[in-house]
Regions:
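Alpha-helix boundary/capping residues
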Residues: 35, 69, 97-98
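Vicinal oxygen chelate
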Residues: 22-26, 57, 73-74, 79-122, ...
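Core segments of cupin and vicinal oxygen chelate
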Residues: 12, 19-60
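N-terminal beta-strand motif that seeds the catalytic metal site of vicinal oxygen chelate
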Residues: 1-29, 60, 77-80, 129-132
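Generic structural signal for helix capping and beta-alpha/helix-loop junctions
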Residues: 50, 111, 130-132
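Short secondary-structure boundary/capping segments
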Residues: 7-10, 43, 53-55, 69-73, ...
Length: 132
């Protein structure tokens, strides 16, 4: 059941960081930065660990490559979605860069290809359907 709240509650809130569980931050950094073109936003010591935050090429919410969440083992992130303006172009480029990606699939919500990072975290690269 929905709860009614003040109309200003969380009015300015947005998702800014999504944690991606990895086993090796350096290997993951090479994949996300060198292979996918993400930009490093922060790479700094963090409570005896390493805070590694990246932004996708088009901006928007960032990802943090994490090793410390006990209930998020490496490879457990599923259903992550990156939106693109041309999934077929990007699928061909992924293959050229050595990334295994499924053949593009058409669905009611757009055309997508699925890929995985070195730990097995699952991403969809999605091209939204053209508006009528």
């Amino acid at each position: 059941m929905a709860t009614t709240t003040s109309s200003s509650f969380l009015a300015g809130a947005s998702i800014t960081v999504v944690s991606i569980p990895v086993s090796d931050q350096d290997r993951a950094l090479r994949f996300y930065a060198d292979t996918l073109g993400f930009e490093v936003v922060a790479d700094a010591p963090f409570a005896g660990l390493r805070w590694l935050q990246l932004s996708p090429p088009a901006g928007g919410p960032t990802i943090s490559l994490v090793t410390w969440f006990e209930r998020m083992p490496p490879g457990s992130a599923q259903g992550l979605v990156l939106e693109t303006d041309d999934v077929h172009r990007d699928h061909a480029e992924l293959l050229a860069r050595g990334v295994e990606a499924s053949e593009p699939v058409e669905a009611f919500y757009g055309t997508y290809t699925e890929l995985h990072d070195p730990d097995g975290n699952s991403w969809l690269l999605l091209q939204a359907p053209e508006e009528a």
